[in-house]
């Protein structure tokens, strides 16, 4: 509503003694302007550490959209523009390479009666570990020495989709689809050798293992035992979920409500292990081997149907 301007005396004294004359009604129309904002950061550190992350937001009328990316090797898996959690101890002995990207959109019909929202996210992670150690005189007053090496190669990736359609009003309807997919692999190699004399101090762990692999006891006549353990893990998982919610306002004021939910999952995991130990002393060339393989597949289904009558 629009009124005549207050008199100067009332404005100066901040009083409302004079009644203002009514002029007219005005219908205000909401106008939207286009907005776009973004941020990008990059950094490097010691030990070849680096990170690049950024996000961008877009708003125009009834559409909001955003995108983000986080690329690094500092064990960081947050969503730029959303959260900033930092896990610095996930892989304390190695470097975790992470690539994480995503897109989110929300579309709204004028008047706020119809919405469509979509979230997409993908992530890749990898860990490489090469740990080598040489230990001399592991027992007091002895010449027992050992060397070991641990190699680990781990990779995993994931993809997720969440799409939601919502209709508001006297009748309410919401349909939601959720999809999750992931793959992972993990390879471990562990080597261990025990000697009953001092090992060459000028040879690296890798050089010592290479000599054992080529010559065995011929390379070191004081080699007691040598073990190799290999393990691998392969897995993938898939999950699909559909959810429907509906409600209808009845003419006499009550509500009729319906809900349906269905999900399907498919998981597959393969495990393999191969151990080989050779005892050179005191029993010459006594070999113990162990092999194990396991393949597990699971599929599951579930569904729910519900109906309600709500008295108002």
What are these regions (language model features)?
Residues 4-48, 62-312:
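Primarily recognizes Gram-negative and organellar outer-membrane beta-barrels
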């Amino acid at each position: 509503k629009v009124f005549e301007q207050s008199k100067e005396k009332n404005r100066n004294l901040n009083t409302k003694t004079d009644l203002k004359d009514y002029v007219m009604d005005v219908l205000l129309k909401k106008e939207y302007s286009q907005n776009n904002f973004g941020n990008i950061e990059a950094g490097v550190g010691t030990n070849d550490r680096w990170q690049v992350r950024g996000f961008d937001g877009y708003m125009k009328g009834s559409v909001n959209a955003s995108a983000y990316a986080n690329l690094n090797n500092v064990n960081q898996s947050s969503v730029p523009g959303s959260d900033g959690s930092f896990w610095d101890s996930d892989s304390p002995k190695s470097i975790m390479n992470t690539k994480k990207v995503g897109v989110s959109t929300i579309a709204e019909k004028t008047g706020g009666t119809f919405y469509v929202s979509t979230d997409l996210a993908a992530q890749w992670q990898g860990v490489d570990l090469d740990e080598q150690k040489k230990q001399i005189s592991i027992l007091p007053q002895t010449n027992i020495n050992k060397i070991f090496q641990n190699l680990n190669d781990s990779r995993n990736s994931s993809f997720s989709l969440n799409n939601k359609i919502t209709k508001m009003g006297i009748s309410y309807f919401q349909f939601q689809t959720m999809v999750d997919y992931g793959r992972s692999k993990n390879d471990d190699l562990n080597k261990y050798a025990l000697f009953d004399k001092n090992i060459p101090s000028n040879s690296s762990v890798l050089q010592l293992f290479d000599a054992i692999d080529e010559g065995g006891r011929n390379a070191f006549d004081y080699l007691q035992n040598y073990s190799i353990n290999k393990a691998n893990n392969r897995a993938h998982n898939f999950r699909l979920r559909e959810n429907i919610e509906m409600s209808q306002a009845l003419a006499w004021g009550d509500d009729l409500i319906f809900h349906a939910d269905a999900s399907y999952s498919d998981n597959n995991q393969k495990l393999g292990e191969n151990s080989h130990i050779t005892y050179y002393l005191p029993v010459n060339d006594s070999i113990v081997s162990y092999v194990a393989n396991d393949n597990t597949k699971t599929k599951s289904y579930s569904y729910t149907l519900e109906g309600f009558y709500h008295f108002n």
